[in-house]
Amino acid sequence: MTLDLIKIRRDLHQIPEIGLEEFKTQAYLLERIAEITNGKDFVEQRTWRTGILVFLKGSRPQKTIGWRTDIDALPVVEETGLAFASQHEGRMHACGHDMHMTIALGLLDTMVQVQPKNNLLFLFQPAEENEAGGMLMYEDGAFGNWQPDEFYGLHVRPDFKVGDIATNTSTLFAGTCEVFITFKGKGGHAAFPHNANDALVAASYFITQVQTIVSRNVDPIEGGVVTFGSMHAGTTNNVIAETATLHGTIRTLTQDMSLLIQKRVQEMARGIATSFDLEVDVTLKQGGYLPVENNSQLAKQLMTYFENASAVNLIDCLPAMTGEDFGYLLNKIPGVMFWLGIDTPYALHHPKMSPKEEVLSFAVDNISGFLKTRTN
């Protein structure tokens, strides 16, 4: 069948749902998948919570190729002014996952026309933004005997033009780790500081000291990011704060560097707590947000294919400090992720982010050609 990719994208754009709550999205996808695969006896499918797996059994399979798309949205109030804007208050496909899903359906529609030689798995994965859905599915055994031998996926990128595909042969995205810290002292009257223990002061010293991790503990060639974007302490001007809570992020291009920075953050927090004679609780949450590390051999093959595709402008790009839970799956299964240009002035997660829709047919045409080289 011939899909109306723009209509599908706009349908999906109107029903954004956050991770593990993608019920309408899953229902819509299942309807389209049923239409696409109708009468194809070599296709099987199953669901995992709000996720979907579609398996094309190869005619003479030697391996299984995987294509992954994420399906969740963000808690963002849309400001695009589009006629097909979000119908779910406070929810928006501001990270382009509506584009990802549409491309995946287009690829499925193309690849199902002729039974491939090798197996081909399409993964419609929930909860990329908040719960590392790829990790949850893998750890729960959702793949079973459909687990790919090679895994591929993409992410849209606003500052690249339609026709641009960008990747590299090493790390594409950073690993991310959330940091939650609570300093607990003793509250009291501002006039009697000697009878209290000010958690706000301790937290302030920590915020200053933690800046030295990147400047003095991290190899400048490797790099890293430590950012605390939230600090809450105290209730009014004349009461000494009993507690101070901090929420931050660690971003690195290698897991070893992430572990080093996590270790130093904990050591500094405990050191500050000791020096101020108060308590501290440190919680680190990395989960499935490992660095997205491309398999060098598979990446070279993918880049060679797109380099020879006349419609594609291939870019050998530097890593980005954005995070992606596909990193967990690529830590378990060799594969490649790449950027797809969508040419919009607004960044990912911006309430006015609006991709150029002509990229949909471009992506389906060119990526399906690559998948055919892997499955035949």
From Swiss-Prot:
Domain of life: Bacteria
E.C. code: 3.5.1.47
Catalyzed chemical reaction(s): N-acetyl-(2S,6S)-2,6-diaminopimelate + H2O = (2S,6S)-2,6-diaminopimelate + acetate
Pathway(s) it belongs to: Amino-acid biosynthesis; L-lysine biosynthesis via DAP pathway; LL-2,6-diaminopimelate from (S)-tetrahydrodipicolinate (acetylase route): step 3/3
Assigned keywords, A-Z: Amino-acid biosynthesis, Diaminopimelate biosynthesis, Hydrolase, Lysine biosynthesis
Molecular function per GO: N-acetyldiaminopimelate deacetylase activity
One Pfam assignment: Peptidase_M20
Annotated catalytic residues: 70, 129 (proton acceptor)
Enzyme class (EC, first level): hydrolase
InterPro entries assigned to the protein according to its UniProt record, in alphabetical order: AcetylDAP_deacetylase, Amidohydrolase, Bact_exopeptidase_dim_dom, Peptidase_M20, Peptidase_M20_dimer
Gene Ontology biological process: diaminopimelate biosynthetic process; lysine biosynthetic process via diaminopimelate
Family: Belongs to the peptidase M20A family. N-acetyldiaminopimelate deacetylase subfamily.
Cited function: Catalyzes the conversion of N-acetyl-diaminopimelate to diaminopimelate and acetate.
PANTHER family documented for this protein: N-ACETYLDIAMINOPIMELATE DEACETYLASE (PTHR11014:SF98), PEPTIDASE M20 FAMILY MEMBER (PTHR11014)
Xref: HAMAP family: DapEL
Name used for this protein in its record: N-acetyldiaminopimelate deacetylase
Taxonomic lineage: Bacteria, Bacillati, Bacillota, Bacilli, Lactobacillales
